[in-house]
Amino acid sequence: MPIFSALRLLFTMINYNNKVFVPLSNSENGEVDLSMRFVYQQTGNIVTSTYSGGRIRAGHLIALVDEQGNLDMRYHQVNDKGEITTGICKSTPEQLPNGKIRMHEKWQWTSGDQSEGESLLEEL
């Protein structure tokens, strides 16, 4: 990728750094609790977060963000049963009238039953 294109990518994408997201809804087969908080960190086009709460004792996500702010994510976590669970997620941002971001997520477990689900997160 030419340097100009790489710089343009960095300046046009959504900056998720230090944004805090809370779950609004989650599919029944998910482990995310509605009381959890996700604090995103971003360096370049890489987004990360550590999280815990509810049924999750410890979790980590890593994602690549594209020019439209979409996240291509992988996550792994330890649940309250002591199991390591893993998955993939595609997150699509929606800009709200108040300037905040709502994330529409479609995910799939890559461990266990391989089931799919959807979540909705919103920036605090």
Residue positions per predicted region:
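N-terminal amphipathic/basic-hydrophobic helices that include classical n-h-c signal peptides
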Residues: 1-12
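Mid-chain, well-packed structural core segment of small domains
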Residues: 67-99
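N-terminal glycine/threonine-rich, aromatic-flanked beta-hairpin/loop signature
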Residues: 37-64
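Short hydrophobic/aromatic-rich beta-strand segments that constitute the beta-sheet cores
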Residues: 22-23, 47-49, 71-75, 101-105
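Short, solvent-exposed aromatic-acidic interface loops
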Residues: 52-58, 77-81, 106-113
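A short, polar/proline- and glycine-enriched secondary-structure boundary/capping micro-motif
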Residues: 58-62, 82-88, 112-118
